[in-house]
Swiss-Prot record:
It comes from the Bacteria. Signal peptide: none annotated. This is Nucleoside triphosphate/diphosphate phosphatase. The active site is at R26 (proton donor). It catalyses: a ribonucleoside 5'-triphosphate + H2O = a ribonucleoside 5'-diphosphate + phosphate + H(+); a ribonucleoside 5'-diphosphate + H2O = a ribonucleoside 5'-phosphate + phosphate + H(+). Pfam families: DUF402. Its EC number is 3.6.1.15, 3.6.1.6. SUPFAM superfamilies: FomD-like. GO terms for molecular function: magnesium ion binding; nucleoside diphosphate phosphatase activity; ribonucleoside triphosphate phosphatase activity. Mg(2+) 2 binds at D108, D110, D123, E126. Its cofactor is Mg(2+). Keywords: Hydrolase, Magnesium, Metal-binding. The keyword Magnesium applies.
Length: 180
């Protein structure tokens, strides 16, 4: 059943990541919604329980702001560490929401961005392996490659979640909501 409305500010939701074959990949138990629109969901979490597909669990180490967009095939996790802000970008389907969680399909490719602005494309071998195993359609491959380019442009241009004011605004908003 589809959620009738977008997640509301202050609401706590789960985030569920799937693989192309429909199997659950990873679940974040709780993320606080900072902004929810038809196109963008921004959330915050800290020391959140994460459950892997094999049942293993772990807890995130630092506060993070998460960014999802309904028109782009990626999502971004901004992690606040002692030595600066790190970004972990997942190439994924656009998000959908229902009563259970915010959901997306993880397509293996990732970009890690360091505090100095340098970045690396990760997991290309895993992507090739899963593309063959799960029969990713050629159209999906084209879309994902195009979104890698878009994401790299955003990183280089400090656009969207990579903009310095984005970090300040949403980190402050998360702190404020957590105080209530």
């Amino acid at each position: 059943m589809v959620r009738e409305s977008i997640p509301k500010e202050g609401e706590n939701i789960k985030i569920q990541s799937y693989k192309h074959d429909g199997k659950i990949h990873r679940v974040w138990s709780e993320t606080t919604i900072l902004k929810g629109t038809d196109h963008v969901v921004i959330g915050g979490n800290d020391h959140t329980l994460v459950t892997e597909s094999d049942g293993r669990t772990w807890i995130t180490r630092e506060p993070a702001i998460v960014y999802f967009h309904s028109e782009y095939w990626f999502n971004v996790i901004c992690m606040f560490r002692e030595d600066g802000i790190y970004y972990y970008c997942n190439l994924s389907s656009p998000f959908v929401c229902d009563e259970e969680a915010l959901k997306y399909i993880d397509y293996d490719l990732d970009i890690k961005v360091y505090p100095n602005g340098k970045y690396h494309l990760l997991d290309e071998d895993e992507y090739e392996q899963h593309m063959n195993q799960m029969n990713y359609p050629h159209d999906i491959d084209i879309i994902l490659r195009r979104n890698v380019d878009i994401l790299q442009q955003w990183i280089e241009q400090k656009k969207g979640p990579f903009a310095p004011d984005f970090i300040k605004v949403w980190k402050d908003r998360y702190k404020k909501i957590r105080q209530y």
